[in-house]
Amino acid sequence: PPGLPPLLDKHFMGLCGDFIHRHHEHTGHLPGAERLTRFLGGISVPLFTKLKARGIPGFAALEDYPYAEVREWAQAHLNDL
């Protein structure tokens, strides 16, 4: 199979914006890089059930990418918020 396109080509807020907004509404704070990585990788945790994360655009959008690579990408973008 062909290689995955670089994460640099991905639009952070396009993939995570709705999740970040819903997470902030529910918890009162922004999600961290680990939580965003789980969302983008399609890894369910109990909070995601409450947030109905599977129905949020972007859920599992980066599931084919290595976890550590997605976490670094998410952390870099969180630092810019």
Give residue spans per PLM region:
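Accessory DNA-binding and partner-docking regions appended to nucleic-acid-acting proteins
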Residues: 1-81
